[in-house]
Curated annotation (Swiss-Prot):
TM stretches of this protein: none
Name the UniProt record assigns to this protein: Proline--tRNA ligase
Organism classification: Bacteria, Pseudomonadati, Pseudomonadota, Gammaproteobacteria, Vibrionales
Catalytic function, reaction form: tRNA(Pro) + L-proline + ATP = L-prolyl-tRNA(Pro) + AMP + diphosphate
Species, as recorded: Vibrio campbellii (strain ATCC BAA-1116)
A Pfam family matched in the record: HGTP_anticodon
The keyword Acetylation is annotated on this UniProt entry: no
């Protein structure tokens, strides 16, 4: 490709509204342009990378036995009513009506459509297992689109759906897709982790996310220093506290704490160790509890894990904290003075709190705390659950090593849905005994456009993008210096361009009438891995200059050897 025939829309300055590196560089490198909030046009350079990601994903998903389809972006609203997700999805699900006032939605995902298809097309267990996928545009009406294509409203996604006769078959399909994801991300040259995850709004039981590791990642992931255990912060657990609770050494005393509204203030003003304090949080209860409010108790230096809390049957979902007015109406005290002693509300205690002794907590009286509290003696322990976020250094639940925390960008997610959707939509087949069997489903997604941004977050320097070879828009750049003034340079550049393209190598030939500095800057900015510089001075010595984008190393290569040198670099 010649730049004279190409839309190379690079920018010198970083746009003000670009927050993260990938967004900045995608704009500067001429990969995308914003059309409206969360909506982007993919320019040629960006589209070439997007297609590279698509093709790798397609090849590995095909190799896993899946079959490609293509489903409409517009879906009938009635399908979403069948599964009950029409309301669960909330405002992210964009609804509209056609000219006949029939309700539709713009597809954020396709479980309903694919389940409807399979229930109409598949009737016998002999047609199973079946795994169908598509690479298609999706739309989620994000409240606050940001970070460019990382959190856009419209995005490109691979979504696959497996159908099996039983759970054993589902587990095989799930493992095959897990392995395909690993192969795809390995080929892309990304540093990533598959991690245990919560199933969220999709539903089902087991699920894993795939995270590209990057400091700018929105998600926090925990993994063992000694094993392959890994989970996102929502799902991560520490090993259960070991040992027995220590015997009491203090009497419970009521202490005036007028200026201690937070755990930090309590610790500072009264000399308590923070790990000897607890905080009590009032949240809305579910219908399973004979109360409007339930209390959750975690250690003072720990944070409540909202997803773990939401997953408790006693807690309303989505999680909603009680207001100050509701607290005072119940116990006559406000936040900062709450605790388990004398609390006439159901409460659940975190595992780390259950093994505490001689601890401090609010007294359910404004500006007062109890110190020296002990379970059994001063208050009954009751229900114990894992309620907290893990912290770095916690013992791994697998029993090997401790937990490390790193930031990651979620680029893929796989779910064992079970029969959540197939049962709701009566998707079954005749089994070997002639009876109807509801199918076991798996669903699998890769954010194709998000992978592009994630790769940049992991591969860049102050000059621009450093693409892994498998994702680069072009493999090789040819930069002829002052080509329009030197016939020798022009002839050598044209000859090399013809040779490399004839070999199937993707080459960007910079034939613009530009200063060499501009040409070099653009090639570095868009991240082409291998650059060949052709100039009069080096040619007089019989050489071209080869530059490796990742290492920055420059090498003089004999003109006669340049093609073989390039081939060697691409292997």
């Amino acid at each position: 490709m010649r730049t004279s025939n190409y839309l190379l829309s690079t920018l010198k300055e970083t746009p003000n509204d670009a927050e993260v590196v990938s967004h900045q560089l995608m704009l500067r490198a001429g990969m995308i342009r914003k059309l409206a909030s969360g909506l982007y046009t993919w320019l040629p350079t960006g589209l070439r990378v997007l297609r590279k990601v698509e093709n790798i994903v397609r090849q590995e998903i095909d190799n896993a036995g899946a079959v490609e389809t293509l489903m409409p972006v517009v879906q009938p609203f009635e399908l979403w009513e069948e599964t009950g997700r029409s309301e669960k999805m909330g405002p992210e699900l964009l609804r509209f009506t056609d000219r006949h006032t029939r309700p539709f939605v713009l597809s954020p995902t396709a479980e309903e459509v694919i389940t409807s298809l399979v229930r109409n097309e598949v009737s016998s267990y002999k047609q199973l297992p079946l795994n169908l996928y598509q690479i298609q545009t999706k739309f989620r009406d994000e409240r606050r689109p940001r970070f460019g294509v990382m959190r856009a409203r419209e995005f490109c996604m691979m979504d696959a759906y497996s159908f099996d006769i039983d759970k054993e078959g589902l587990e095989k399909s799930y493992q095959a897709m897990h392995d395909a994801y690993c192969k795809a991300f390995d080929r892309m040259g990304l540093e990533y982790r598959p991690v245990l995850a919560d199933s969220g709004a999709i539903g089902g039981s087991g699920s894993q996310e795939f995270h590209v590791l990057a400091e700018s990642g929105e998600d926090l992931i925990a993994f063992s220093t000694e094993s392959d255990y890994a989970a996102n912060i929502e799902k991560a657990e520490a090993a259960a506290p070991a040992g027995e609770r220590a015997e009491p050494t203090q009497e419970m005393t009521l202490v005036d704490t007028p200026n201690a509204k937070t755990i930090a203030e309590l610790v500072e003003q009264h000399g308590l160790a923070i790990e000897k304090t607890v905080k009590t949080l009032f949240v809305k209860a579910s219908d399973e509890v004979d109360a409007d409010i339930i209390a959750l108790i975690v250690r003072g230096d720990h944070e409540l894990n909202e997803v773990k809390a939401e997953n408790l049957p006693q807690v309303a979902s989505p999680l909603e904290m009680a207001t100050e007015e509701e607290m005072r109406a119940l116990i006559g005290a406000g936040a900062g003075s709450l605790g388990p002693v004398g609390l006439e509300l159901p409460f659940i205690v975190d595992r780390s709190v259950a093994v505490m002794s001689d601890f401090g907590a609010g007294a359910n009286i404004d500006d007062k705390h109890y110190f020296g509290i002990n379970w059994g003696r001063d208050v009954e322990l009751g229900q114990v659950e894992d309620l907290r976020n893990v912290v770095e250094g916690d013992p791994s639940p697998c029993g090997q090593g401790t937990l490390m925390l790193k930031r990651g960008i979620e680029v893929g997610h796989i779910f064992q849905l079970g029969n959540v959707y197939s049962e709701a939509m009566n998707c079954g087949v005749l089994g070997p005994d002639g009876k109807n069997v509801i199918l076991e489903m798996g669903c699998y997604g890769i954010g194709v456009s998000r992978v592009v941004a994630s790769a940049i977050e992991q591969n860049h320097d102050k000059y621009g993008i450093i693409w892994p070879d498998a994702l680069a828009p072009f493999q090789v750049a040819i930069v002829p210096m002052n080509m329009h003034k030197s016939e020798e340079v022009k002839e050598a550049a044209e000859k090399l361009y013809a040779e490399l393209t004839a070999m199937g190598i993707e080459v960007l030939f910079d034939d613009r009438k530009e200063r060499p500095g501009v040409m070099f800057s653009d090639m570095e900015l868009i991240g082409i891995p291998h650059t060949i510089v052709i100039g009069d001075r080096s040619m007089k010595e019989g050489n071209f200059e080869y530059k490796n984008r990742r290492s920055g190393e420059k090498t003089a290569v004999a003109m006669a050897d340049i093609v073989e040198h390039v081939k060697a670099q691409l292997q």
